[in-house]
């Protein structure tokens, strides 16, 4: 504190005040502090010390009278009958004793303790000059008792006396002293001794508690305060139990009359009381007394001792003027007896409401009590009202989320015909069903667009090393609107001629060198497919792009994939540049295109919007320079940058399995520099880069930001769209890859289980309709993106009656292993833009495996749908034949014959008829007899009359309508039953 700065909490310790009191003084003195850890200057500290001696917070003032009553009642019950007359005195003295008085007595005691003789009562009277300000409050407390006590009160009895080795000798003198002297001196010694004993207990109680239980002893203690004093520890064992300390204060008035019964040789030195915590101490004391009543535990718990210490200071102040030190020392020993042997009947009543808290906080530190505390702590969780399921989870995780037992979930699922164990993973649908079974609402997670950028490639460390990078431009739009042709015109190549069917079916990444403002520059173009099946590819292209070029044909306008491309670009939050293509055609209507785009929120600049629209002709190469200039202009506004001086990060654009080179992946480097020999992790795939090839087929040694290259050296084909990162440590990279691979494996197993899982209800339904049909497929494609597109298209096919099971889907050529798998499972091999390995076709012919090859996704989907329909059993449907009206009824034998006129179609013998009378069908069955002019005929066409007879129906009436129909078998479709 002699330094230039003083902390608030140090000042509060010095003044024996709480931190909040010091903060109040700071507020009054306009000293800017934030908390108890704030620092102030020594001058400001002096001001606070000055005001602290004059004015202290009086918040606890109103609490003292109430608490004093509690102590009085409790003390009366615990102590002998002789204490009652003294209780009234203590009550009046406490009521008249202000809160500020207690606080004012704190500091002088500790900082300037007077030396005194062995006799405790007489010693406080020897040093009245140390703190005249504090003697005045003491006089107030003693004044109700007697006039002779008033002169003794001004003397600083409560000021901390120096430690003395032999306080016991003063104890016998205390009972012999005059009443006035005993009361006044005991007020000081009582508070002194108790506070000191409590502070002593904080440090030494754990070791001395067992010794002091049978008999109170005087032990020298070192107080928390600067001045060391000696304290009596008659019940150190009880002190951690706050009720003992409180009991002393409560019982102090009554104990005064019974000193002869106790060994009164234990005077207590007064230490500055802290009345501000008295209320807390009293509550804990009551709790502790109740806990001791039910169970004896003498071990100390330090947190409680600290609270008792502080609170005890406050309570002793109230009884300062009345209680001699001898009576206090006598009062403390009986507490353990009442707690251990026979609890006093009076104490439980006020502390009963706090009994549970008492057991937990201060009943002792024994292992048995801790076990009881754990048992008494029922950790019962209630299920949440609603949960959000974002991914698959194990049954145990689901049980934790729902706060229910795993066995309950297993039981519920088993009752629904789903057998599962505790380690299995629940798919989303099953988890949702489980939650609903337990009345927990499931909130569907917010579906994020696949084009939304989820990962920030730049780190904080990169911000100081950023450099400009070329823009990545994605060409998007509807199929056949000229995206690849536009890119060809820019690159002056012929990519589109090599596309099957003239449509792009994978992403191509290309670099274009251009000159802008006299400086060479580069643009990286990503060409995405426009067919509806390649939504994932378009989303992936938009996710990694900086600028999106939306190609719209001037003669076709906005189409479905155009709208989807707009949504992808908006989800990725990238600027859009519209290229209105095919301006060289006669039917070009650029204004109509602009109008349609305006309806989608893309208003051209010439119309007052912010979207750049450039009319171009990809075939003739018209206006391409303007388009490139606009791209560079937008890229300058975007301020594209990256840090090339770090390990590379980026995204997998495409991946496939090459027959000669193995797994090949096309990467877009988004940050850092990729080099040959780097350890790379892409999703769950790890590898070491053996070679890198540019888009023009040239080998390169490194790839800077915004460059797309093909790499060789991966362990397997990664998933397109996965992000990759280069690691300096192969061990770290392998650990990350293995962890991701395990998660992917679990997910794949769960999907396989969910696709094969059947419930009891579904089994019964299949038993009624026949076995559920399955179409097994082995799918091989050229690149990973094509595999994704095909799988997505297959999932959109209706599979209510025929289920598609893809046993294997991977990029690469068709091998003999694939043929063996198809032969064992009765599957069809689908090859998309791929070839057959040597020996695969011969093996397929020997095994009788059907291999279908496609290069356009349209035909593939049509044939797959036809194969699924071929597995369906033909359906018998009703086909109408004709309609006739009954105009006469002729009785024949026992029955009758209807004379009819065929109104439409024809009526055929041995076919089915339905007789309607009004809106009611009176007969539905076979037509047994058909005659025309008394001759049996096979059929009668419309416009002719005929006679119709039925063996099982003869109640014809004129006006009946006869509907003729027949049942025929027709091929069923996946859309539904044929009608």
From Swiss-Prot:
For this protein, the record's PROSITE patterns field holds: G_TR_2
Region of interest (G2), residue spans: 502-506
Which residues lie in Low complexity bias regions? Answer: 54-63, 139-150
Give the start-end ranges of region G5. 617-619
Annotated region (G3) at 527-530
Positions with a binding annotation for GTP:
477-484, 527-531, 581-584
Alphabetized GO MF terms: GTP binding; GTPase activity; translation initiation factor activity
Q: Where is this region: G1?
A: 477-484
Bias regions of kind Basic residues — which residues? 263-278, 294-303
Where does it reside? Cytoplasm
Which region ranges are annotated with the description G4? 581-584
Give the record's keywords alphabetically.
Answer: Cytoplasm, GTP-binding, Initiation factor, Nucleotide-binding, Protein biosynthesis
Q: Tell me if Amino-acid biosynthesis is a UniProt keyword of this record.
A: no
Q: Which family does it belong to?
A: Belongs to the TRAFAC class translation factor GTPase superfamily. Classic translation factor GTPase family. IF-2 subfamily.
Q: What is this protein called?
A: Translation initiation factor IF-2
In which organism is this protein found? Picosynechococcus sp. (strain ATCC 27264 / PCC 7002 / PR-6) (Agmenellum quadruplicatum)
Lineage, top ranks: Bacteria, Bacillati, Cyanobacteriota, Cyanophyceae, Oscillatoriophycideae
């Amino acid at each position: 504190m002699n330094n230039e700065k003083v902390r608030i909490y140090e000042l509060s310790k010095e003044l024996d005040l709480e931190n909040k009191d010091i903060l109040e003084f700071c507020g009054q003195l306009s000293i800017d502090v934030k908390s108890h850890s704030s620092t102030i200057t020594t001058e400001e500290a002096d001001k606070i010390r000055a005001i602290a001696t004059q004015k202290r917070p009086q918040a606890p003032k109103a609490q003292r009278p109430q608490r004093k009553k509690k102590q009085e009642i409790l003390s009366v019950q615990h102590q002998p009958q002789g204490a009652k007359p003294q209780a009234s005195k203590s009550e009046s003295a406490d009521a008249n004793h202000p809160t500020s008085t207690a606080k004012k007595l704190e500091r002088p005691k500790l900082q300037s303790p007077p030396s005194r003789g062995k006799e405790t009562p007489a010693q406080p009277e020897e040093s009245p000059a140390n703190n005249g300000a504090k003697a005045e409050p003491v006089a107030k407390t003693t004044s109700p008792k007697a006039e002779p006590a008033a002169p003794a009160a001004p003397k600083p009895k409560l000021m901390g006396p120096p430690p003395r080795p032999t306080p016991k000798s003063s104890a016998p003198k205390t009972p012999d002293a005059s009443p006035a002297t005993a009361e006044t001196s005991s007020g000081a010694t009582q508070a002194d001794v108790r506070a000191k004993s409590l502070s002593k207990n904080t440090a030494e109680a754990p070791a001395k508690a067992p010794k002091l239980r049978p008999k109170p002893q005087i032990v020298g203690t070192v107080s928390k305060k600067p001045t060391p004093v000696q304290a009596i520890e008659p019940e150190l064992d009880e002190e951690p139990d706050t009720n003992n300390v409180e009991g002393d204060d409560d019982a102090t008035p009554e104990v005064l009359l019974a000193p002869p019964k106790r060994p009164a040789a234990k005077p207590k030195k007064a230490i500055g009381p802290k009345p501000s915590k008295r209320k807390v101490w009293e509550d804990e004391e009551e709790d502790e007394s109740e806990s001791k009543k039910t169970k004896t535990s003498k071990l100390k718990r330090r947190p409680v001792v600290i609270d008792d210490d502080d609170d005890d200071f406050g309570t002793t102040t109230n009884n300062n003027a009345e209680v001699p030190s001898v009576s206090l020392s006598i009062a403390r020993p009986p507490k353990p007896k009442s707690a251990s042997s026979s609890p006093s009947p009076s104490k439980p009543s006020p502390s009963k409401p706090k009994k549970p808290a008492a057991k937990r906080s201060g009943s002792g530190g024994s292992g048995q009590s801790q076990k009881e505390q754990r048992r008494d702590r029922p950790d019962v969780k209630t299920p949440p009202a609603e949960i959000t399921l974002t991914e698959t989870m194990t049954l145990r995780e689901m049980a934790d989320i729902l706060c229910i037992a795993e066995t309950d979930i297993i039981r519920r699922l088993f009752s629904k015909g789903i057998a599962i164990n505790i380690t299995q993973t629940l798919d989303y649908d099953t988890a949702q069903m489980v939650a609903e079974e337990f009345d927990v609402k499931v909130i569907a997670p917010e579906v994020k667009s696949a084009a939304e950028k989820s990962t920030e490639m730049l780190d904080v460390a990169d911000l100081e090393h950023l450099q400009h990078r070329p823009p990545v431009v994605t060409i998007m739009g509807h199929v056949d609107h000229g995206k690849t042709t536009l890119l060809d015109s820019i690159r002056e190549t012929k990519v589109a001629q090599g596309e099957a069917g003239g449509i792009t079916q994978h992403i191509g990444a290309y670099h274009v060198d251009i000159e802008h403002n006299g400086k060479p520059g580069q643009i990286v173009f990503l060409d995405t497919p426009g067919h509806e099946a390649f939504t994932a590819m378009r989303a992936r292209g938009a996710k990694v792009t900086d600028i999106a070029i939306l190609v719209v044909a001037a003669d076709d306008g906005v189409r479905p994939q155009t709208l989807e491309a707009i949504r992808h670009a908006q989800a990725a939050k990238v600027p859009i540049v519209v290229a209105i293509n095919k301006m060289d055609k006669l039917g070009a209507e650029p204004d109509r295109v602009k109008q349609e785009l305006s309806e989608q929120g893309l208003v051209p600049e010439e119309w007052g919007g912010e979207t750049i629209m450039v009319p171009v002709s990809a075939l003739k190469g018209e206006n391409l320079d303007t388009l490139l200039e606009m791209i560079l202009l937008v890229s300058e506004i975007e301020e594209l940058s990256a840090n090339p001086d770090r390990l590379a990060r980026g995204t997998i654009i495409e991946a496939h399995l090459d027959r000669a080179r193995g797994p090949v992946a096309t990467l877009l480097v988004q940050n850092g520099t990729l080099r040959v020999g780097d350890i790379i992790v892409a999703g769950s795939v790890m590898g070491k880069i053996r070679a890198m090839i540019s888009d023009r087929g040239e080998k390169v040694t490194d790839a800077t930001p915004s460059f797309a290259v093909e790499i060789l050296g991966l362990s397997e084909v990664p998933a397109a769209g996965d992000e990759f990162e280069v690691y300096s440590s192969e061990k770290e990279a392998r650990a990350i890859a293995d962890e991701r691979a395990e998660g992917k494996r679990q997910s794949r197993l769960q999907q396989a289980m969910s696709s094969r899982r059947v419930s009891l209800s579904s089994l019964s339904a299949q038993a009624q309709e026949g076995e559920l049909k399955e179409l097994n497929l082995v799918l091989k494609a050229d690149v990973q993106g094509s595999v994704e597109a095909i799988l997505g298209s297959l999932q959109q096919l209706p599979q209510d009656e025929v289920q598609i099971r893809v046993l294997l889907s991977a990029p690469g050529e068709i091998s003999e292993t694939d043929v063996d798998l198809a032969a064992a499972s009765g599957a069809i091999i689908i090859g998309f833009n791929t070839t057959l390995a040597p020996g695969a076709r011969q093996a397929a012919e020997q095994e009788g495996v059907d291999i279908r090859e496609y290069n356009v996704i349209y035909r593939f989907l049509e044939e797959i749908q036809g194969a699924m329909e071929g597995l369906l059993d033909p359906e018998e449907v009703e086909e109408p034949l004709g309609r006739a009206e009954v105009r006469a009824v002729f009785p024949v034998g026992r029955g009758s014959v209807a004379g009819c006129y065929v109104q439409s179609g024809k009526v055929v013998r041995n076919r089915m008829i339905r007789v309607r009378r009004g809106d009611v069908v009176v007969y539905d069955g076979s037509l047994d007899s058909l005659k025309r002019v008394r001759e049996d005929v096979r059929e009668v066409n419309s416009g002719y009359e005929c006679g119709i007879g039925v063996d099982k129906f003869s109640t014809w009436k004129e006006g009946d309508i006869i509907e003729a129909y027949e049942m025929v078998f027709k091929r069923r479709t996946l859309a539904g039953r044929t009608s």
